[in-house]
Regions:
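A conserved active-site cap/scaffold subdomain adjacent to cofactor or substrate pockets
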Residues: 224-282
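Histidine-anchored nucleotide/phosphate-binding helix
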Residues: 64-83
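C-terminal non-catalytic interaction/assembly regions of soluble proteins
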Residues: 281-424
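An acidic, phosphate/nucleotide-engaging active-site surface
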Residues: 100-167
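Conserved phosphate- and dinucleotide-binding cores of soluble alpha/beta proteins
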Residues: 134, 145, 154-226, 232-233, ...
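N-terminal amphipathic/basic leader segments beginning at the initiator methionine
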Residues: 1-34
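Short glycine-rich or small-residue beta-strand-to-loop segments that form or flank ligand, phosphate
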Residues: 53-62, 85-92, 382
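Glycine-rich phosphate/diphosphate-binding loops that line cofactor/substrate pockets in enzymes
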Residues: 38-55, 78-79, 258-259
Length: 424
């Protein structure tokens, strides 16, 4: 059923122009060599003993070179005489099932065959103690396989969180608590409210480190182009001191959309592999409960989502941040996985499906006509692949002068209709 009378569809949308955004391109020259060197630091290598059963905790984010990093760590542990295995550390992702979480890892090339070690996936958890916050007392739990290992190694990306600000946000502490907490632990911690996470997550992580055999963490930082910028092995007793420093580095490497105002933002794809919120609030300025605090990016009036990523496996948690979604995208949503994740994270808003539109033109028109003060003859439209890959964007005619004035932006000699745009 059309959203508008036939005459409204006669409005011709402006051509889109390809623009390159310039950020710091520094990245690791050799990821494998860096991992091996870090593993052989005295304070790291001395923690590994022959015969140890070591749980490598791996999450659900689409991290560049993740399979290579996991494989290299596993190889080095085996060379040291240890017996490593992988446990999914992703809270309620993968539909909140053991099989689903294994499938998420498989999507990243992390399988028993590829890595050469077992993958032990279970929702069974062990209670290890309690922590306090203003909302009450919460029982902290840890994956059963990890809790009974001789050593635990969380492997994860450090970056700003999507819902709160604090000295420690997304990273090793979150992996140890929400990730290894599986569905039960994730639900319990989120039930306390993300407003308490700046202190709750570090406190819970300290309990995990004190009560379980956490050896060290593998901290990964990416640059603005989704490339591996930094890898560091952090001993367990230094995680709480080092992670805030790593977060500052990660924050400085975050990309952004370098225009000031956007009437309609079209996002080609979203998913849990891109961000816990499907679309990173640090990029779009929208979080589960409104505008993201201290957001310094563009003022975005309306957002249209075209599709889900393959590696999100139908989990559209965060789709509620959009205003409109293509009908074809909505039909690919796994409601079970989406609702499980949204409810366990205390964010039912993120699981609400926006108004469905038949095609891109109808979606963009809906964005423009529901915006405030939009000049329909010169709309400011931006098209991105996702919120992780922002080295290239497409902008409408009305933004060209702003692009030309910004030394970080390069206007290319390419144009396309937004209806036909599909970034690779």
């Amino acid at each position: 059923m059309p959203l508008f009378p036939e005459s409204a569809y006669q409005l011709e949308l402006p051509k889109m122009h390809r623009v390159l955004q310039k950020f710091d391109t520094t990245q690791l020259e050799n990821v494998e060599e860096t991992v091996r060197a870090e593993m052989h630091k005295k304070e790291i290598g001395s923690l590994v003993k022959p015969g140890m059963r070591i749980a490598m905790a791996v999450g659900s984010r689409g991290i560049q070179n993740l399979a290579l990093i996991v494989k290299t760590v596993a190889d080095e542990l085996q060379n040291m005489g240890a017996m490593p295995f992988i446990v999914p550390a992703m809270g309620s992702h993968g539909g909140g099932t053991a099989k689903g979480q294994t499938a998420v890892l498989e999507g990243y090339g992390i399988t028993e065959e590829a890595i050469g070690i077992p993958v032990k996936s279970s929702l069974e958890v062990d209670e290890i103690g309690t922590v306090e916050c203003e909302s009450g007392t919460v029982q902290v739990v840890v994956d059963h396989y990890a809790a009974h290992a001789d050593l635990i190694i969380p492997i994860g990306r450090v970056k700003p969180h999507t819902d709160f600000r604090g000295p420690i946000e997304s990273g090793l502490c979150k992996m140890l608590t929400i990730g290894l907490g599986k569905f039960e632990g994730c639900t319990r911690l989120h039930h306390m409210g993300a407003i308490h996470f700046p202190t709750l997550l570090p406190d819970a992580a300290k309990l995990v480190i004190d009560k379980t055999p956490v050896g060290f963490g593998v901290a990964i930082i990416e640059n603005s182009y989704d490339q591996t910028y930094h890898i560091e092995m952090v001993p367990a007793d230094k995680i709480h001191d080092r992670e805030p420093e790593l977060l500052k580095i990660a924050r400085s490497k975050m990309p952004k959309i370098l225009v000031k105002e956007i009437d309609a933002l079209t996002v080609q794809e979203m998913g849990k592999d891109i961000s816990g919120a499907g679309m990173d609030p640090n990029i779009i300025g929208r979080a589960a409960r409104g505008r993201l605090k201290d957001f310094d990016g563009p003022e975005i009036q309306r957002i249209l989502v075209k599709s889900l990523t393959k590696d999100t496996h139908g989990n559209a948690s965060g789709i509620g941040l959009a205003d409109y979604v293509l009908k074809s995208c909505a039909e690919t949503i796994d409601l079970g996985a989406t609702y499980t994740n949204s409810v366990s994270c205390g964010n039912p808003e993120g699981g609400r499906i926006p108004i469905q539109v038949m095609d891109v033109k109808e979606g963009v028109l809906a964005c423009l006509r529901s915006g405030v003060g939009v000049d329909l003859n010169a709309p400011k439209i931006v098209y991105i692949k996702n919120t992780l890959q922002l080295g290239e964007i497409w902008v409408s005619d009305a933004l060209i002068e702003e692009v030309r004035r910004n030394p970080q932006l390069i206007l290319c000699d390419e144009e396309q209709s937004i209806e036909k745009l599909q970034m690779s």
